């Protein structure tokens, strides 16, 4: 008899292990693997080892480097302590970053709560007390009814057995979405730093261009006064005065626009730093305090997709969609839930802990969907969401590649433009010096001298804009390659790569 029971028990155990093995083989889909990086298109990379140089401020050549450390804050290479302090303030006080940080904490807590639910058994203490009356007539018997009390105390334990892998995939999806929030926060930080740097450079450019514009207005006023004097002496016609007056008013019309742009830049800078516009003094930036970075990153596409936080965020969403598809697949297979309870029941509180009051129960429940049209539809919907996430990831990668290629071309092209404008400025300066010598010798009029001075001022305004653009190009390139955060050098992905 004992041998028969032992054989039956062994057969039951083998059947249980066989069922577990079969369900484990139906685990919800393969593990997520990071998409292959795009091919390294050398045609988008700079063909030279350095940019063009110009004989002017902020005109030095910049070297391209494929092994540049991109984890450090890149904005410190611009050489402005005021900018460093303002970016630090913005990173600490920005309400946009505060919102992103709170959203990340929410995702982390939700992930922890769900992990505790799916990975660990659930235990509950249940205390009960009830009073009820029974009627013998309900059982076809005669006699009066009986009233009694029932006291109970028990501990129940429940655990969902994750043989099909649905719980594991659900946790993977939550972890991926938490990582998505983290990468979004990093992208917001980098975007904020780049915006502050760009607006500060714009403000410095406006200061220099405002000085040049005011000098042009002063020069035209001098020319107009001289023309009126010549008209009074009969040496010029009134048309000359009218022409100069038109040029003067045209130049003056740029001053309100310049003031508007300067105020808008100040307001934007205050907002980025977490301040209300006009509530506190902001640093006054000038081009002379900035330094052009000597080395710039030359990044190949396969490295870029591992570095930019927005690409990593898109990859996290792709992994979450893959895990959601696994959850939908797992629902098609049997679900097993184990539960157990141990406690006491008695008619009175005093007898609750007596030797005969112990009760217990063990339950193993297996649920196999037989007819549920919603489950296949959910699986197809999850597959469509996975395909959409894959397409979105590809779009983000392509946009990142385009952004870096455009930024590199802008660095090269604007360096060449600055060199040309520097030559134009030098030619205007040489022309002015020649006109000054001729005026001193009496072979050139004062009007000709003023015209030469105005040409120099106009060339200087264009030169200032080109100098500021080189700084802006460098900042945008660092942002495009994902520099400035700890994950820029090596990104730890969710699947252990």
What are these regions (language model features)?
Residues 167, 176, 183-300, 410, ...:
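Periplasmic alpha-helical coiled-coil/stalk elements that build and connect Gram-negative outer-membrane
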